[in-house]
Design a protein with these regions (language model features):
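Peripheral terminal and linker regions in Fe-S/redox and tRNA-modifying enzymes
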Residues: 1-321
Length: 321
């Protein structure tokens, strides 16, 4: 279900106050005792969007203006990975790619040390599960880039690694239907070894329909499910495509259902070739060979969503954009 517009406009100086008011309303009124419904959407369903707005205004202490009739801001999404000058003269922020956001204790200590030594002791996290070190003087940049940690947390990762997002998955979440983090990293490494990819492609893995990794706003979103193949229950995914964020944002649509994870790679290869300009490397052979791999993948008469009758699958390739 898509988010419901609050029909509100605030000046940028009031954004933090508004967010705080929304959080306090949820803290005080939200169904947090029921873990199945401990999300903001359930409170909005209970109150209705108009009453929710009233509650937020009361907490904020003033009436909210109505939203602008249309989005007039031209905005391009940035991932903040790399080195960027700040508006403060002589300072930079450095964005590190943390593959699928997986940090160990030693990594955290290392990041804290690096922030202290080269920056102002501050770290920021992004929605793509990456880390930003702000306030790095020009004079310290070169030394920071020599830190061993940056061999794993790169400032210039490969295109698919750069944009990869994954939820916690079944290893640490009882709601997840599939393992996500390790599988997604392994899959991306194989895809990058077999394809030349001209630009980042946002691939988001989420373990269940709760969509913590936001697959509906990704170029390619993978939502965990259970499938049947040859009479066995396997981990699989439904595939979403075409999601965008920023100006004229919209949710992606489900283009393929019930793909066993063990059969997923050739499907992703074909999607990347057809929709994102990827070119198979020489080691892959010609595209006809690739298509034969794909046909073997989708000829799965006994594969279906749990509870549904087995049927032959037809793969539909959607053009993103």
């Amino acid at each position: 279900e898509a988010a419901i517009p609050l029909n509100a406009w605030v000046d940028k100086s009031d954004v933090v106050d508004l967010c705080e008011a929304i959080l306090i309303v949820y803290r005080d009124r939200g169904p947090r005792a029921n873990r199945q419904k401990s999300r903001l959407m359930w409170l909005i369903d209970e109150l209705g969007i108009e009453q929710f707005r009233v509650e937020v205004e009361q907490q904020l202490g003033r009436t909210l203006l109505s939203a602008a009739p249309k989005d007039e801001i031209i905005w391009e999404k940035r991932d903040h990975i790399g080195i960027y000058p700040q508006k403060q003269s002589g300072l930079n922020y450095v964005g590190l790619n943390v593959p699928v956001g997986r940090l160990g204790a030693s990594d955290m200590f290392d990041l804290a040390r690096i922030a202290d030594v080269y920056g102002s002791g501050e770290l920021r996290l992004t929605v793509e599960e990456n880390v930003i070190i702000p306030n790095v003087p020009d004079s310290r940049l070169e030394s920071l880039l020599q830190e061993p940690l940056l061999e794993r947390f790169s400032i210039d990762p490969a295109p698919l690694t750069r944009a990869l997002v994954s939820c916690t998955g079944s290893k640490f979440c009882n709601f997840a239907l599939i393992e996500t983090k390790s599988r997604s990293v392994a899959m991306i490494k194989e895809l990058e070894a077999e394809l030349s990819i001209p630009k980042p492609v946002r691939i988001h893995w989420t373990g269940c329909p709760n969509s913590c990794a936001q697959p509906q706003v990704a170029d390619i979103g993978l939502m965990g499910t259970k499938v049947r193949k040859n009479g066995k229950t396997l981990e699989g995914v439904d595939i979403y495509m075409g999601g965008t964020v920023g100006k004229d944002a919209h949710l992606g649509t489900c283009v393929q259902k019930s793909i066993p994870c063990e059969d997923l790679k050739p499907v992703l290869i074909q999607l990347l070739v057809d929709n994102f300009g990827a070119v198979p490397n020489q080691s892959l052979g010609n595209v006809d060979s690739l298509n034969r791999q794909l046909q073997l993948t989708v000829d799965r008469d006994e594969t279906a969503v749990l509870g549904a009758k087995p049927q032959t699958s037809t793969v539909i390739f959607a053009r993103s954009g």
